[in-house]
């Protein structure tokens, strides 16, 4: 996976070189180590900060030519706001602010990991490192000519000066693997659809075998034998046959019940016969954001040797118009035996998930299942791009997901489920139809999925607004966000993973 910067840790005593980055709070105070590093130039720097009307707000940045007496060429001051009020994810954002100020010429950068109240804890220094890597990522491999501003932070070597190098490295080791998982998810979402189609996506998921993940790929023949009629109906119009990929990480006790994560992987969605408008159809390469998250999560958990058994399952298809494509009015039989009338071929993601959810629930009997899908435009109307929609049949699981969202910044908002919505997907000809009215569209989609989880505790995350194309954030300027990897890693680590 590409990395625009290299991040390491050095002791406070190490000499700064190239560009020096320091932190100050909203009172414009520096810590003692920072003051010592600035030396005789400290008073000059303080005057320059005051003269610039810099307020020290969290994430704000001031770029200065280093004054005489400093053995660096450039000085960057990053504001922390009220340092005592900073939470873990706020520290990650500070790292993002650091990366945002790096430029092509910054081959060597030293960041002093100190807040005005004292040295950052090892976990905080690790969070800064994570933020730097997340924000520095960019997807530009298909550009043959790059502008100067396309190369910001490229090839920078960032040294984070800390009180305890060994402790910082230990804290960053698992975090670094999670960042790798986020970057992998972003890479998958950003890839063009002529490169990343179902068979290729399955091959990339299979690379997790290098980390000790067991990977099983179900082809059309295997899915036909399993009677996955809902998923196969979606893929039948494409020249690229569908795949289902089952990934298993056995990091817990042998035979212990696994947890499961399921992702929608529509590698390109034209809408099928119910074809979408051409405007922005190119964005539908990202309709596999849920599957990308699951692969990124499995990478993170396996790489950091998570002490838990985990199933990751993704259904991979293309939804294309063709003489062999599924039609409105068709009735398909899902793996569960339930029949589905196709009203709109553009409501295809729920059909893919229906069979994969049922397969996982029946074969692996997980403790819980969380599915992720860029499922409905309706969730964007309701929640915009700052929260994913959360639907669940289990209050404890929903509460834990909500807490993990708050701690990581990958926020969720719980939406309702209830039998009163079922009538919208009742069919005259089959057990159900694949879409209801426009009203409550994200709810009826989740209501549909609930019919395929049996009695398993389950949560559905509608990530249509958060997985791709959202406004740039403190830690992501890429089109694909990698949303969900940090959220679900935190859920597992906090509540389900065996403690050492």
Swiss-Prot record:
Record-level Gene Ontology MF annotations: manganese ion binding; metalloaminopeptidase activity
Active site: 276, 350
Enzyme class: hydrolase
One Pfam family from the record: Peptidase_M17_N
Cofactors demanded by this protein: Mn(2+)
Binding site for Mn(2+) 2: 264, 269, 287, 348
GO CC terms in record: cytoplasm
GO biological process, one term: proteolysis
Protein name according to UniProt: Probable cytosol aminopeptidase
Organism: Rhodopseudomonas palustris (strain BisB5)
